[in-house]
Every structure is written in C-alpha cells, then in structure tokens.
C-alpha cells in the first residue's frame, strides 16, 4: 500500500511538468498516427552526435541504432526459439574440425545510400576491427581469425587459428553483436575510432531523420527502399513511417506519457504498470491478466555465492541456505507473485521449457541430498500451485487449470525445509543461540551481507530484499549492501553473497538449445585468486565434471543433437552442486498503449520478443496495425 501511495504522489508531481508537453515538443512535423514512440531504456544519450557503435565505447545503441539502423548476419529470438538469417542467407558452414567458416550473404540487400551490401563489407569490418585495439571484438578476432576473405561477391571465408564451433556467435545479435559496417564509408576515414558516422547510413529499414542534441530523443524514418533490407525481404514493410525513441525518465513520467497517448511502448515497474492499466483504457500488458509480465526474457535471476570463500565453498552450506528459502514467500516479497520460478540455471521461457525443463522434471523429482546418512528429495512440484493460491488471496484473477498454472508460474522449485537446513548447518558446526539466532562455528553471530545494485526497482535489488527477509525468518542476520560499485566488487571477489553480476548463470542464447554460452563461464581455466579480476562466472566455482561437459561441447556443432544432452548434464551438475541459486526468470514489465497501434507481441501472440530496446524490434514493426485514430 505504501508503494502505491508513493507512486501516486510521484505521478502527481510529474504531472505538473508534463501536462503541457505535446508531440510537437518531442519532434517537429511528425504525424502522430504514422509514428510509434518508444522509451529509451538505457536513459538519456551521452553522445547524441555520435552514431559510430563499432569502437568498444558505450554509445546508446538502443536509441534505434541496433533496432532500426543496423542489420546483423544472424539474430536470435527468445520468443520463437529461432535463429533468423538476416544479412546472411543461411546458417554458417563449418569444416569438420571447426577451423574454417563460410558465410553466404543474402543477395539484393543495400545500404540506404544505394550501395549494395556484399562480402566486401564483412571482410573489411573484421579486418578493420583486428587493426584497432579500441574496437569491440578486437581481442576475440585477433585470437581466432587467421585470415578472412571473399571467394565471390556473396561468400565470405574465415580461416581460424584454432577450432571454434561457435565462432559465428560473434555475429549473432542478442542485444549485442558484431554488425557489419559500410566499407565504402569507413575506408575513406582516417581515424575510424574518432569518426562519428554522422549522418549514418543504414543496412536496416529506417534512416535517421533528426535527433535532439541534448540526448533526449532520436527520430527515424522508414526507408523508401525498405524492401532492399533483410527486414523487408523476410517480413514485409514496417508499418510506422516514423519511429521516435524518447527518454521520458522514471516510470511515473512514462505512465503520464502513455495516459496522454504520447508513448506507445514503455519500460515500467509493476506499480507503474498497474497504474496505467487502471487509468488508460487503451493500455495493456504483455499478458492480459495477472501476472502481466513478459515470460520470454532469456535471463534467470537469483543468488550468487562466493565459492572462493568459506563457508560458501561448502556444498552442504549452500544447500542449507537454499532449503531455508520459502520460494512462495520469496516471490511474494520480490514481485507480488508475478514471476515464473526456475529450479534450473536457465530461464523458464516457453522454448527452454520444451528443451530442458519438461525433460528434466522426472530427474528433479528424484534429486536428493544426503542428510543424516539418508537421501532427502529436494524438489517440490507443488510450488506453482501455492503461488497461484497466494495470488488469488491477493485478489488476482489466476487460472485454476494446473497446466495453465505451470505455464505461468513454472514447473516447480525446491522445498522449504528449514528442519533439513538446520541439520546441515549443525553438522557443519553452526548452532543457534537462546533466541534462535544462528552462530558461526566459532560462536559469533552469523551475519550475511548481500551485495546488490542500488536501484530499488531492479530485479537484482528485489531479489536481495526478498532473500534478506526469508533468511532473517530462518534466524540469520542479514544486511543488504546496495552500491553502484557492485560490479567491481564482484569482479575481484570482494563479496559474500550477491544478487548482482552475471545472474546465477550467464544467460543462454535465448532462441537456441545450445547452452555452451551458459556453461563455458564455469570453466576452471578462468580461475583467478581473490583480489584479481575474474573473467569467468563471478561465483568462482569450478568442477571437473563441468569442465568435461564444456570440453565435449567445444568439439561439436551447436546444432548437434548431442548438444542438448550435454546441456542437460551441465544443468544437473549445477543443480546438484548449487554454486548459485536460480530463483525466477527475469520478469519483464512493459506497457503498450493501443490508441494508435495494435497487434504488439503478446502472450496470446508471441511472434517476436516484445522489447522495443532489443534489435528484434525491426522485425516486430511489419506486424503492427494502425488503428486509424488521428
């Protein structure tokens, strides 16, 4: 209730400054009914005059550069579970030992200035990046590329210094990739690092129209020759003639903008989403009903133990603290039950449900740990039913069909077993004082500091808050340490427990069953002592069985049927060892205003990942439908 009241107050304060704002103040001479307006997720643009995103410098790619201006060779879509061939017309072709990769270029694609996109652009992009250490992907390309060349206008050959069955993933867009640059522009530039690429030319379906020098907005206009882009060839004409990316600021200002029909796609908090759904009859969420959230995000949130420090290097302690979590209370505290729980170290998206969760559920039901010399089954398949029941008690409309409940809230999680957790802790020298508070083996009060970033609306912070409460209930003193330095502290191992960093496991590709991207971060070759920068997963956990899984994955194509088997083996090892705790899939909270446009991606029609900040946004635009309102 306090959160709602605070949100209303902030909303009213924002209204004072926003009430006079119209579209004419956002961009000049733009017909509103031909324009879709989306929020800039990453905030105000720090370098609005610079459109050169190839140097390893943050240049706000989500202002439309990655969504509209540039096409990749390939792009992955977590909603459909597919990899889309974009500027490449087919999958990469490898030789038997993965030391050569051939790329076939899609014919008939053109840069917006009329120059054809060819193999020359790809070859030049890679060679230029290898020449300048300030360029993104410089280290990776210099590590792997022996030679890159074309054999004809539409064929590129990469000869590699050493085998890499996933070399193509450097060009696979999933909120970041090496996207080809225009050779005919950059070859005339003396300094490609200092070059601002202004005005930019596009390989994608939109070109720059105008932008705010202050960094608040960028306006893009559909290319007249949109059909000569991968977007046009694959999906047809993008329906909006104009796309305006605008940074509105915090949620309350985005809510006001949507209520005034000046923002079609917003990045909201749950409080903001509830507000706009109540005040704008044209507003909707990804789901029509509770829990409203996006369930196709390829990230899983949760808890990270520092396995290089005691007692977190003890598997029994990690399991004790896992079983001390009542996940139903936890998700109620974190997101008012609006989540999909995940017992595995990958997101519980529909695609991964089919690839991994459902096949592994029988194994999860029989997963045991040893307590007092006896096996104890740790998995609880009834968790989603309990979440649904608690959500109903809060007044939410929740289905009663068990299958629907599992689709929404997940297949299950781990048991809340404080008695078992207590036995494991006592076995390892911990004990309770007369007030029931836990003491360490040396008799001192046990206090756990939980590291997290400072934004209370972030999923990381909400995990930390919920974790703090459930462990306190179990008798452990906790402190949430919220700091902007969380990333630095994690990189050098200066933490105990965290909900920040690289998630409980690095997110997978999202639209492909290959889990190498997730497992590879646990490779023991990355290990560094505390105090040194850690290039692998920040939990600093290593395991010889996981090393074997990773080594086998490196030997096979990511499309190999064996890959899924290896992925399952890796997930089993992570579940058994619990070096980190997965809690729930990242709950994306977006708001659509359907006053001017409809047919957004939704839970009923998940034809594309629904995020306007993802590079897939350009593939959403051909499917939008104008309402005809002026």
List PLM regions with ranges:
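N-terminal lobe/hinge region of extracytoplasmic solute-binding protein
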Residues: 22, 37-96, 127, 201
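A structural "hinge/loop" feature
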Residues: 39-64, 86-90, 115, 137, ...
């Amino acid at each position: 209730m306090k959160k709602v009241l605070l949100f209303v107050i902030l909303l009213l304060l924002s209204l004072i400054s926003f009430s006079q704002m119209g579209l004419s103040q956002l961009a000049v001479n733009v017909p509103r009914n031909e324009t879709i307006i989306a929020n800039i997720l990453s905030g105000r643009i720090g370098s609005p005059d610079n459109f050169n995103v190839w140097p390893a410098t943050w240049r706000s790619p989500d202002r439309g550069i990655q969504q509209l201006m540039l096409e990749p060779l390939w792009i992955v879509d977590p909603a459909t579970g597919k990899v889309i061939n974009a500027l490449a017309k087919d999958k990469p072709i490898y030789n038997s030992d993965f030391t050569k990769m051939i790329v076939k270029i899609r014919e008939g694609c053109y840069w917006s200035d009329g120059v054809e996109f060819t193999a020359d652009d790809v070859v030049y992009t890679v060679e230029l990046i290898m020449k300048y250490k300030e360029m993104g992907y410089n280290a990776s390309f210099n590590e792997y590329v022996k030679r890159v060349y074309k054999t004809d206008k539409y064929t590129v050959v990469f000869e590699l210094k050493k085998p890499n069955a996933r070399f193509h993933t450097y060009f696979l867009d999933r909120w970041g990739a090496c996207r080809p640059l225009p050779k005919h522009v950059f070859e005339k530039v003396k300094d490609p690092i200092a070059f601002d690429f202004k005005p930019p030319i596009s390989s994608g379906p939109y070109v720059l129209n105008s932008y705010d020098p202050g960094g608040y907005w960028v306006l893009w206009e559909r290319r007249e020759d949109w059909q000569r882009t991968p977007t046009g060839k694959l999906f047809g004409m993008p329906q909006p003639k104009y796309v305006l990316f605008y940074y509105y600021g915090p949620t309350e200002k985005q809510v006001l903008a949507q209520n005034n029909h000046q923002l079609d796609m917003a990045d909201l908090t749950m409080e903001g989403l509830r507000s706009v759904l109540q005040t704008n009859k044209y507003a909707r969420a990804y789901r029509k009903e509770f829990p409203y959230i996006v369930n196709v995000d390829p990230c899983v949130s949760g808890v990270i133990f520092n396995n290089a420090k005691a007692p977190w290097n003890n598997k029994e302690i990690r399991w004790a603290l896992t079983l001390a979590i009542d996940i139903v209370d936890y998700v109620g505290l974190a997101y008012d039950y609006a989540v999909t729980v995940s017992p595995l170290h990958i997101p519980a998206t529909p695609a991964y449900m089919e690839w991994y969760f459902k096949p592994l559920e029988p194994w999860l039901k029989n997963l045991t740990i040893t307590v007092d010399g006896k096996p104890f089954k740790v998995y609880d398949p009834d968790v989603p039913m309990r979440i649904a029941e608690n959500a109903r008690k809060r007044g939410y409309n929740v289905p009663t069909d068990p299958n629907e409940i599992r689709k929404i809230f997940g297949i299950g999680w781990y048991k809340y077993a404080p008695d078992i957790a207590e036995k494991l802790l006592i076995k390892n020298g911990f004990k309770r004082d007369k007030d029931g508070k836990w003491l360490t083996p040396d008799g001192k009060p046990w206090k756990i500091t939980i590291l997290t970033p400072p934004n209370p609306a972030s999923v990381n912070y909400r995990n930390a808050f919920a974790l703090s409460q459930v462990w306190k209930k179990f008798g452990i003193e906790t402190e949430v340490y919220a700091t902007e330095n969380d990333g630095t502290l994690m990189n050098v191992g200066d933490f105990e427990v965290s909900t920040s960093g690289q998630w409980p496991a690095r997110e997978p590709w999202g639209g492909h069953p290959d889990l190498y991207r997730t497992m590879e971060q646990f490779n023991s070759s990355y290990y560094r002592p505390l105090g040194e920068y850690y290039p692998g997963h920040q939990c600093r956990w290593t395991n010889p069985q996981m090393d074997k899984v990773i080594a086998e994955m490196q030997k096979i194509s990511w499309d190999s049927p064996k890959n899924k088997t290896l992925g399952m083996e890796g997930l089993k090892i992570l579940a058994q060892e619990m070096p980190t705790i997965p809690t729930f899939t990242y709950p994306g909270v977006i708001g659509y205003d359907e006053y001017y446009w409809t047919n957004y991606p939704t839970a009923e029609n998940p034809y594309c990942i629904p995020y306007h900040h993802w590079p897939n946004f350009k593939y959403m635009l051909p499917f939008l439908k104008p309402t005809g309102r002026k």
